[in-house]
Amino acid sequence: MNSIFRKIVFAAFLLLALPQFALAVRIKDIAAFDGVRENQLIGYGLVVGLNGTGDSDQTKFPVQSLVNTLERMGITINRADITVKNVAAVMVTAALPPFAKQGNSLDVLVSSVGDSKSLAGGTLLMTPLKGADSQIYAVAQGGVLTNSFSYGGQAASVQKNHPTAGRVPGGALVERELPNVLAGRSQLRLNLHQPDFTTASRVAAVINNKFKMTVASLTDPGSVQLAIPDDYQGKTVEFVAALERLEVTPDVMARVVLNERTGTIVIGENVRISTVAVSHGNLTLYVKETPRVSQPAPFSSTGETKVVPRTSIKVTEDRGSLAILQQGANIGDVVRALNALGVTPRDLIGIMQAIKAAGALNAELMVI
């Protein structure tokens, strides 16, 4: 099974290693205009209608929240008479997209903050959602979808997915609009998602070539300053639409990304390796415990029965193979050579780190 998995993994690497041509992409896919971004919203609310899976009586703040809600509706009740097994206190979060208009709907995330067991089947009561400036920008309410369940008895339980968090699709309505950051501006700034000197220079060149004048200028590798032409003054939306459709070929750094927790390796197309020899061998340690019982002779008055440990250890080391990677080897050469050694993805992580330590990996090595 491990052999089949190893072959599948390295077959995928070989497919990635096939010769590829750098593709031009739209500016809108690699950059964003300054100020055009999402804003985070948050609120505190109650989910009701739970089938006994709400917060326990030991969690005090849901009871107080429910009392306050009922009092605002003109219902007076003694706090000691309330149990909240069908109610759960939750934090509600949402992302307010740029240019969202009053009345637009947003998806919201609902997460339990108490000790409730499940939010499945519950209904989120009206919850104001505030921004970082403490202003209310949306109000959320609706049925909670969890796509999960949790059932149990005294001796066993079963759970699917995460029942204490869910979504309310389209559950929030925008009540306050964000200011239009593009209106009335004579200059804009384009921020690259991945700052790079070469990519920024190419973006500026493509824009200037489009408008046949100096519209874009470089300030740093992460941004391009734009002066709106006279023909587009008061027509910022048209200017942005014409600009973001332009195509440019981005440049990327040679990079190898390793995730030691999952054994994932991602190798960029531009990675090159200097001449280096790689040897890889496997060490297998086999330990077996075989305890034995030692008993005294029959009718003995002084002896006692004891358990005597017996341990056997066997160490086997596979014969290491040697692969030579020539100078300028690309990702395809690397994968083919290491595949010949029979390495696993986790072995490849250690090999890449060793090649980098030897000074032969001409790329950035990023461990996440």
Swiss-Prot record:
Keyword Signal tagged: yes
Keyword presence, Signal: yes
Pfam families (alphabetical): FlgI (PF02119)
Stretch forming the signal peptide: 1-24
Subcellular location as annotated: Periplasm; Bacterial flagellum basal body
Keywords: Bacterial flagellum, Periplasm, Signal
Record-level GO BP terms: bacterial-type flagellum-dependent cell motility
GO molecular function, one term: structural molecule activity
A single Gene Ontology CC term: bacterial-type flagellum basal body, distal rod, P ring
InterPro entries (alphabetical): Flag_FlgI
Domain of life of the source: Bacteria
Purpose of the protein: Assembles around the rod to form the L-ring and probably protects the motor/basal body from shearing forces during rotation.
Family: Belongs to the FlgI family.
Subunit field text: The basal body constitutes a major portion of the flagellar organelle and consists of four rings (L,P,S, and M) mounted on a central rod.
Protein name (record): Flagellar P-ring protein
Native source species: Geotalea uraniireducens (strain Rf4)
Gene name of the encoded protein: flgI
